[in-house]
Amino acid sequence: MDSSCIDEISSSTSESFSATTAKKLSPPPAAALRLYRMGSGGSSVVLDPENGLETESRKLPSSKYKGVVPQPNGRWGAQIYEKHQRVWLGTFNEQEEAARSYDIAACRFRGRDAVVNFKNVLEDGDLAFLEAHSKAEIVDMLRKHTYADELEQNNKRQLFLSVDANGKRNGSSTTQNDKVLKTREVLFEKAVTPSDVGKLNRLVIPKQHAEKHFPLPSPSPAVTKGVLINFEDVNGKVWRFRYSYWNSSQSYVLTKGWSRFVKEKNLRAGDVVTFERSTGLERQLYIDWKVRSGPRENPVQVVVRLFGVDIFNVTTVKPNDVVAVCGGKRSRDVDDMFALRCSKKQAIINAL
């Protein structure tokens, strides 16, 4: 091989190596260099240095209303701050609805002069209703979407108690309250079972009563997802339950909201729940409850033997024990008592 061929091969090899090295060391294209400046409301602004333009890529649209924040599922949340702590007011389908909920909470937390989204958010009597309830109660109404219903029921009740048949104010609220109670009709009663007040978080409505008093809108109950039904208790509090048909068990049930009712009223198996309806034009539904009469059943006692002593749990209520019921809640002071029984001396010693 002559020297000219060697020179040509060397030069071509050098050129290819130089081109490869230059290709590896070349900077990335300008379009790949982007700086991100994060903005409020979950939005990000992309800065493109090549053409000097700003393009905005929004993940969640921000709201124009005070106290309203977007949610990943497309809905809108409402929140308010109290002593540097965030108080969640619930999630809503429309941001206007969330804004009104914020306004209501702001009026309760900060008074009539609070900064709100809409003017004239409070009507006559609304401020008195807010002041008559605690902040926690108002927040609970907003979260459960029952504020409007409870306000409406309160206004009707106040109007009925203050005006007689001739349109004049009546100072005797007790007499009017008796009339209110007399205008109700009892639909049905049910003694709740252990599963009704257990961890299933549902109340089974007897089929004959469900189809007669609470018919579902769909011709076939199996295809409906259920409806929300509002009930008012004896204290004027509105309870909203989801009422639906379970095709698996072929039963009508109250689900969402029922566990909260069981917890607040301290319901136990055997207690009786009463469903009522007003005879007036509004056809308002009511719910009430009462403690089962008679002694409770004696449960099976679990005995543990420790150091020659039988230790067992006494869960029955003795005749001399007092069970107090006040405001729909009963005392549990006598429920949990322990007794020691010595195996040698058949004496029972109650220890608190």
From Swiss-Prot:
Keywords for the protein's UniProt record, in alphabetical order: Activator, DNA-binding, Ethylene signaling pathway, Nucleus, Transcription, Transcription regulation
Family named by the database record: Belongs to the AP2/ERF transcription factor family. RAV subfamily.
Alphabetical GO biological process terms: cellular response to hypoxia; ethylene-activated signaling pathway; negative regulation of DNA-templated transcription
Region ranges (Disordered): 1-26, 46-68
Record keyword Transmembrane present: no
Residue ranges flagged as DNA-binding region: 64-119, 188-291
Taxonomic source organism: Arabidopsis thaliana (Mouse-ear cress)
Record SMART domains: AP2, B3
Keyword Transcription: yes
Name this protein carries in UniProt: AP2/ERF and B3 domain-containing transcription repressor RAV2
Xref: Pfam families: AP2, B3
Compartmental location: Nucleus
Highest rank taxon of the organism: Eukaryota
Extent of Low complexity compositional bias: 1-25
MF GO annotations: DNA-binding transcription factor activity; transcription cis-regulatory region binding
Its biological purpose: Probably acts as a transcriptional activator. Binds to the GCC-box pathogenesis-related promoter element. May be involved in the regulation of gene expression by stress factors and by components of stress signal transduction pathways. Transcriptional repressor of flowering time on long day plants. Acts directly on FT expression by binding 5'-CAACA-3' and 5'-CACCTG-3 sequences. Functionally redundant with TEM1.
CDD domains from the UniProt entry: AP2, B3_DNA
Gene Ontology, cellular component aspect: nucleus
